[in-house]
Amino acid sequence: MALSKIDVANFLTGTIPQGNVANASLGAVTALPAAIATGKVLQVSNFVQASSAQTFSSTSYADLTNVTVNITPSATSSKILILSNIGSDLNDGEGYGMQFVRGSSSIYATKTLYTLYSEGVTQVYNVNMFNYYDSPNSTSQQTYKVQIRSYNNASINISTSYNSNIQVMEIAG
């Protein structure tokens, strides 16, 4: 059996014939990012934050005042990335749930309630980050907002030491 030695460093030089490459030529690969229009950030909304603290004491969802933002997608294939931070002041055994609402419909709700159970600590200020990737399939203006509900009807404070906020981005889809 004959053995061949291949010079790997100089194995391929020159130009590959066009018929051997499915994409016209290797030079066309640089055009690939332009050919794939998904994933680009097309627009970013204003950063909107709560202007004052708010207390929630019901297990039913209620709006987080002023934490609402509008965006008008440029294409029906666009996705909307929702970014939100919720600042809370929880006492031991208290907690909350949150949901994102588009128009009047819930599009995402936490599966579990964020609760504080800590031995020896009576009060904690914290910030939780919530993100969601939405597909409104529309070029009409979309309104997104945050709603909060209490755990076990406890009276919880939101946006006391940290102003809760929301921001959205249109992503090419």
Q: What are these language model-derived features?
A:
Residues 1-53, 173:
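Glycine-rich, low-complexity segments
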Residues 47-48, 54-57, 61, 72-141, ...:
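Terminal beta-strand-rich extracellular "head" domains
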Residues 63-65:
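Short, solvent-exposed loop/turn segments enriched in Ser/Thr/Gly
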Residues 67-71:
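Extended, low-complexity regulatory regions
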